[in-house]
């Protein structure tokens, strides 16, 4: 849900202002995560990956939703679908996932806990497949704490990967060169930043364009 205190007009207001400024609007989302103080957590505590009868370990004040659970898959798809269907002006989105799984237990798998990682990834791919099928023309970047989600299956559903949070142009040369041995150049997202200000702007732009 949109925080109306911060964004009184919601996402619609942002897309409208972006259009007035002559730029396209993109959104950065993290739909696999959940805040333990959220309404969703209060309604569905069984949707969260966490070990029962043990102290819960948090990462960045978040927990991970159990994508091995089909109901959670439907919810995550619904979140993204709601954004894109209600706001067709959204021209791009970045899908991030910054938290490792710190409480390894799926309430939905019962005695099949050994399947958690495999079923989680399969559940994620099911969600991504549905999104890509419904919104094939929306460019999407996949990120996970940097480049932790660079894999061929994911590339079926995303336009590009975020290779690394390291945007130093000198270091980025090695990152992009190494990644190019496995993935096409057009799959590597790269930004021009002020990291390593000793380099001139043209060099940073040249590296970002690969």
Please identify what each model-predicted range represents.
Residues 22-23, 84-87, 134-138:
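Secondary-structure transition into beta-strands, especially the periplasmic turns and strand N-termini
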Residues 29-35, 97-101, 144-148:
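Active-site-proximal loop/turn and secondary-structure-junction residues that shape catalytic pockets
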Residues 35-74, 118-210:
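Glycan-recognition surfaces
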Residues 4, 9-21, 116-135:
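Alpha-helix-loop-beta-strand connector modules within alpha/beta enzyme cores
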Residues 1-78, 87, 92:
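Aromatic-lined carbohydrate-binding/catalytic grooves of carbohydrate-active enzymes
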Residues 79-121:
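N-terminal/domain-start segments enriched in small and hydrophobic, helix-friendly residues
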């Amino acid at each position: 849900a949109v925080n109306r205190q911060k964004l009184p007009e919601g996402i619609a207001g942002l897309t409208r202002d972006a259009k007035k400024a002559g730029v396209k609007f993109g959104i950065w989302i993290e739909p696999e995560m959940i805040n333990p103080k959220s309404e969703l957590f209060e309604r569905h505590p069984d949707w969260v990956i966490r070990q029962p009868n043990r102290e819960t370990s948090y990462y960045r004040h978040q927990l991970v939703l159990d994508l091995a659970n089909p109901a959670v898959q439907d919810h995550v798809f619904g979140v993204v679908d709601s954004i894109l269907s209600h706001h067709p002006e959204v021209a791009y989105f970045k899908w991030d996932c910054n938290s490792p799984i710190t409480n390894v237990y799926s309430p939905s798998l019962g005695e099949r806990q050994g399947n958690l990682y495999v079923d989680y990834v399969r559940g994620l791919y099911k969600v991504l497949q549905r999104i890509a099928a419904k919104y094939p023309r929306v460019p999407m970047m996949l990120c996970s704490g940097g480049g932790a989600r660079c894999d061929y299956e994911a590339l079926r559903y995303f336009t590009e990967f975020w290779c690394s949070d390291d945007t130093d142009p000198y270091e980025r040369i090695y990152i992009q060169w190494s990644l190019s041995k496995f993935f096409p150049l057009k799959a590597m997202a790269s930004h021009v930043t002020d990291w390593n200000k000793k380099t001139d702007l043209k060099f940073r732009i040249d590296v970002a364009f690969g």
